[in-house]
Every structure is written in C-alpha cells, then in structure tokens.
C-alpha cells in the first residue's frame, strides 16, 4: 500500500482518481482497456469529496459504459434517507454521469427483512463479479475509515470481498492506494 499526503482533501481525491484511471487504461486485468470495471463504494461523508472531484474534473476521462457500481456497506434506511450511502452517491455522482440502471447494483437498505436482503445482494454479487478462485473480486473499492460512533452498529449491511485496488480517502488530506 502506498500512502500519499496531499495539500487538501480534493487533491487527495485527485490522486485516487488519477491512479484508478491509469489502471483502467492498462492493456488488461484490473479493469484494463476494454474490461468491465467493477467498482464498489462505501459510505460516510468523505466519499462526497471524491464523487464531486470525479464529476467536476474526471467525468470526461472515465469510460462510464464499462462501469458497474456496487456498495460494500449500507445503513438499513430508505434510499431517500439522509443516512443512505446510495443517496450520497446518487446526489454527488450517479445523477451527474451517464450510467444506466443496469450498471448500478445497490443494497436495498429499506427492506424490512435484512437477512433476506443480505442473501439477495450476496447472490447477485457472486453472479456478477469475476472470481479469484472461488472468491468474487472488485476491481476498485472506495473505502472509508469508520468514525467511532459508527463502530458496533447493527443496523447496516457490510460486504467484505477481495479487491484489486483499494482507494481510501481519509478525512483531511491522505490518500491510500
């Protein structure tokens, strides 16, 4: 893992996006040229910075037709709730880029039967992602570091899988690749 310290959070987001797009342009593997790019988002407030920079500065450079978007965590709330990770991504990214509904795979946090939703989402992810052996793998995963107030919560979904490149934007100005 490489640690990069930027002058500010927006510059850290730029570092992450430049790195991701460079990998996508490689001839093959990890979302290389022509491959489907499977990216997973987490929640919290920090991704908004990443999404905003992506839309403002990197949208035209991103091959959106190759992207499939997933989530690795979601709170058990409606997709319209202010605490929904999907809602954050929708407002700051998804409503501003040319993705179709067939490219977006969200966790349905509003489902009353959380266990059933976990099974549905897990099965769908298993059927969509490429495998490393028998384990599904995301090409990129944007992760956050949970605040202490979030740790120990039970009203959320969390999905842990392998990923080829982890993009971590910490509050402040640190990018981990």
What is each residue range found by the language model?
Residues 1-39:
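N-terminal glycine-/serine-/threonine-rich phosphate-binding loop
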Residues 4, 23, 51-56, 68:
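Boundary/activation segment at the start of structured domains
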Residues 24-34, 58-61, 127-135:
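Alpha-helix termini
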Residues 41-46, 143-145:
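Glycine-rich beta-strand-to-loop/alpha-helix junction loops that act as flexible
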Residues 62-139:
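Ligand-binding beta-strand-loop-alpha-helix segment within the catalytic cores
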Residues 140-175:
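Class I SAM-dependent methyltransferase SAM-binding "motif I" and its flanking Rossmann-like core
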